[in-house]
From Swiss-Prot:
Membrane-crossing residue ranges in chain numbering: 38-60
Name of the protein this chain belongs to: CDGSH iron-sulfur domain-containing protein 2
Observed phenotype of the null mutant: Premature aging associated with a shortened life span, probably caused by mitochondrial degeneration and autophagy. 8 week old mice begin to acquire a set of aged appearance phenomena remarkably similar to those of premature aging syndrome, including prominent eyes and protruding ears. Ocular abnormalities are observed: mice develop opaque eyes and blindness, which is accompanied by cornea damage at 20 week old. The opacity of the cornea is due to debris deposition in the scar tissue outside the cornea. In addition, corneal neovascularization is observed, possibly impairing vision.
Pfam families in the cross-refs: MitoNEET_N (PF10660), zf-CDGSH (PF09360)
Gene name of the encoded protein: Cisd2
């Protein structure tokens, strides 16, 4: 039953459809087609365009995929939210840099790991820098 339907489509209906298409004999003949002729050609041209795209798609360059979709890959993963609290009065340095990319080996302090992260992912993250006000 199903094969009979497929055979009928391939052997009878498809050839009849293709015979009725207003395909001109030359390239200049396309300019003489009417709007109704173009509308009858539209499904056929759409199928040809789809098949052409599917044929050449494997040769298109692949999109660059991000290597790291998660931000925090390893720091305090047992906690539902990582929070580091630092008292500003306790800063004995005049300047401190804190990590925002989660790649630092000295987290929460920044060790410059964001540079490699930015290079790999195209991101632009940098450290949080705290400075003491000069009086």
């Amino acid at each position: 039953m199903v094969l009979d339907s497929v055979a009928r489509i391939v052997k009878v209906q498809l050839p009849a459809y293709l015979k009725q298409l207003p395909v001109p004999d030359s390239i200049t003949g396309f300019a003489r087609l009417t709007v109704s002729d173009w509308l009858r050609l539209l499904p056929f041209l759409g199928v040809l365009a789809l098949l052409g795209y599917l044929a050449v798609r494997p040769f298109f360059p692949k999109k660059k995929q991000q290597k790291d979709s998660l931000i925090n890959l390893k720091i305090q993963k047992e906690n539902p939210k990582v929070v580091n609290e630092i008292n500003i009065e306790d800063l004995c340095l005049t300047k401190a840099a804190y990590c925002r990319c989660w790649r630092s080996k000295t987290f929460p302090a920044c060790d410059g790991s964001h540079n490699k992260h930015n290079e790999l992912t195209g991101d632009n993250v940098g450290p949080l820098i705290l400075k003491k006000k000069e009086v």
